[in-house]
Amino acid sequence: MELTTEHEELKRSALKFVEDEINPYVDEWEENEIFPAHELFKKLGDQGFLGVTKPEKYGGSGLDYSYGAVLNEALAHIKCGGVPMAIGVQTDMSTPALARFGSEEICNEFLKPSITGDLVSCLGVSEPSAGSDVAAIKTHAVKDGDDYVINGSKMWITNGTQADWMCMLANTETDHKNKHLNKSLICVPLKENGKRAKGVTINRKLKKMGMHSSDTAEIFFDDVRVPQ
């Protein structure tokens, strides 16, 4: 395919943003082993970069994935790996399933403010005993009245110390015979009124060999209640 004028305009604006708003601060963020996710994501959201392929009804641009690829190529000009990885978690890991399958109510609560950059998100799949073996995860969400009650832990969570909510994979049918069919994605608030949500503990921020500017965490969940 050939890039259109619209593709080129997106590329130019994204490259300018990278050079003006990100690269001048990369060395500082790498040294501090964290970057100001809320501040940067809000700027990205104001430019429309967090919702390029997301539905227009929730504030996205409603464009096809070729535009997402152009944006990601521009973000590759960031002079570190941690920041573009963190942005990618927000745009391409924690929100796509929500945009496709989420109810209008839950999309308004989580997707819309993630597109505007008012919320920072993370993806919760890997666990201490289940890294690449996703079927072996132990975190479970048990129905109790109108809620799920979640217990377990998640490991190597990008954006983990700063995220406002998590797109979590959990076992929702503990007695199911097929461990590949007993799981659900659940939007789990990690903060309430600016404070850590009840039952959620950021156990530790992990030290890494690279990707230093991206905060990576281990997170515990102890009887965390989430509406079904």
Tell me the role of every PLM-derived stretch.
Residues 46-118, 159-165:
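Internal helix-loop-helix
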Residues 48, 71-76, 169-170, 188-195, ...:
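Short Ser/Thr-interspersed hydrophobic loop/turn segments at strand-loop and sheet-helix junctions
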Residues 62-74, 133-137, 220, 224-226:
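Structural signature of FAD isoalloxazine-binding scaffolds in flavoprotein oxidoreductases
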Residues 139-142:
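A structural signal for short hydrophobic beta-strand segments in well-ordered beta-sheet cores
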Residues 151-201:
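A short core secondary-structure module
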